[in-house]
From Swiss-Prot:
One of two assembly initiator proteins, it binds directly to the 5'-end of the 23S rRNA, where it nucleates assembly of the 50S subunit. The lineage of its organism: Bacteria, Pseudomonadati, Pseudomonadota, Alphaproteobacteria, Rhodobacterales. Keywords: Ribonucleoprotein, Ribosomal protein, RNA-binding, rRNA-binding. It comes from Roseobacter denitrificans (strain ATCC 33942 / OCh 114) (Erythrobacter sp. (strain OCh 114)). Pfam families: KOW, ribosomal_L24. Part of the 50S ribosomal subunit. PROSITE patterns: RIBOSOMAL_L24 (PS01108). This is Large ribosomal subunit protein uL24. SUPFAM superfamilies: Translation proteins SH3-like domain. The gene is rplX.
Amino acid sequence: MAAKLKKGDKVIVLAGKDKGKTGSISSVDPKSGKAIVDGINIAIRATRQSQTEQGGRIPKAMPIDLSNLAYVDANGKATRVGFKMEGDKKVRFAKTTGDVIDA
């Protein structure tokens, strides 16, 4: 299945403790169906000190399920993503506006 959300997309959180917040996707794991969004779903992780890194409580962005994310269109609204053929190329488009996301 083609990826509806990709790295670098601006998304809004639809459900969970960060509902309504927007951010940019920093990584996507298609196998588990999760994505890491910058500044969203932050958890405090305790890390052990090493020779190069200082230990302590470090905030870390945790993965969010892709079903809880929606692409943000040009109007700043959450939209679903569809696919269409443009010439001989398959492109993503925003269902609310019909604008092509990636040419």
